[in-house]
């Protein structure tokens, strides 16, 4: 008997068969304690490492859509100042003047970005080796990274037990989950500092477009610090919900122009009005979904600070989608800052990035 399938039934059948497949990871050890955890999913391949619980590579066919270095990871990442693909914390972004008050107590942090603290300070978790285990499952692989952030290391209150769970599935979706608990009331604002570039030729990302129901950009003052909690609506400014990076960089709007000229591009927190935003070019669509209140977009505006043969990058070689609380929220919002984590209160956050190829 011959079975006839509609296209819809065939697609459902193929999807069921794909999602029923076991997925596997392979570990490759390099020098300096770096392990590369490689997951192959037919059209796509993704690589993580225990150094900074970071993403190293994400290839669609032969096109690497993130910035990084697999072959020389043992040398590349320890010398790299740009946090490529790293888990950042305990606090992502800048804290102005490296100080904050919590319950009327003033905390002095290490200043590692001029007079400011950035990304948790010089002993941030992007620079450490995480313990990890791998769970190979039907339709996905989980890599569970664990560490403890000590107050003695970064001068924030409280020690934090942290799990960072990277999951990759058959639908080419990469999910990051953060689970944490602190011994004291503290600040906790983790994020991943992956740089994306969806161009097949690795050209600058000016041709990428961002879209969401709302694209409210918080303006920056001196030293890239958010100066006001009143953002600028790019949707209203450009009369578009789908806006190309190039149009933002070259805008004649007085406020946008001043910000772009001052900072060389975007390095701004956004309120996207919901949980999802999209970035696309003519080849790919990248969808990010998050439960965090803000997304910081950084378009890699200055690449001159790394004197190394590894530094092959120019301005706008990539862009970040850092899902987090707005940087410096503790000094902007005081005891209403969403980054405040109570003692022994479980923290959970989830962000996913899904890549798909456009059908031309």
Regions found by a protein language model. Name each.
Residues 7, 11-360:
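An exposed, glycine/acidic-rich loop-and-rim segment of catalytic or binding clefts
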């Amino acid at each position: 008997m011959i079975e006839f399938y509609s296209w819809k039934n065939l697609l459902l059948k193929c999807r069921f068969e794909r999602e029923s497949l076991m997925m596997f990871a392979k570990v490759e050890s390099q020098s300096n304690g770096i392990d590369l955890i490689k997951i192959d999913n037919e059209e796509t391949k993704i690589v993580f490492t225990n150094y900074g619980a970071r993403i190293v590579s994400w290839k669609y066919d032969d096109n690497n859509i993130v910035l990084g270095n697999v072959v020389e990871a043992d040398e590349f990442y320890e010398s790299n100042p740009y946090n490529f693909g790293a888990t950042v914390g305990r606090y992502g972004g800048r804290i102005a003047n490296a100080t904050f008050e919590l319950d009327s107590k003033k905390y002095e942090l290490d200043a590692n970005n001029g007079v400011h603290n950035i990304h948790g300070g010089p002993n941030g978790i992007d620079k450490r080796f995480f313990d990890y285990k791998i769970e190979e499952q039907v339709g996905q692989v989980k890599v569970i990274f664990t560490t403890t952030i000590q107050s003695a290391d970064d001068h924030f209150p409280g020690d934090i037990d942290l799990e960072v769970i990277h999951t990759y599935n058959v639908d080419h979706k990469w999910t990051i989950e953060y689970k944490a608990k602190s011994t004291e009331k503290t600040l906790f604002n983790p994020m991943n500092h992956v740089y994306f570039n969806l161009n097949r030729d690795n050209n600058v990302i000016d041709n990428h477009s961002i879209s969401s129901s709302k694209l409210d950009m918080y303006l920056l003052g001196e030293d890239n610090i958010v100066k006001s909690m009143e953002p600028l609506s790019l949707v209203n400014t450009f009369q578009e919900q789908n806006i190309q990076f190039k149009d933002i960089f070259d805008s004649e709007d007085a406020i946008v122009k001043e910000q772009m000229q001052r900072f060389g591009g975007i390095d701004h927190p956004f309120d996207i009005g919901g949980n999802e935003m999209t970035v696309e070019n003519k080849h790919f669509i990248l969808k990010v979904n998050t439960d965090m209140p803000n997304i910081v977009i950084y378009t890699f505006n200055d690449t001159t600070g790394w004197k190394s043969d590894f530094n092959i990058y120019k301005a706008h070689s990539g862009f970040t989608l850092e899902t987090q609380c707005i940087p410096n929220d503790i000094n902007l919002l005081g005891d209403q800052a969403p980054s405040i984590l109570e003692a022994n209160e479980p923290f959970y956050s989830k962000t996913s990035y899904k890549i798909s190829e456009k059908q031309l």
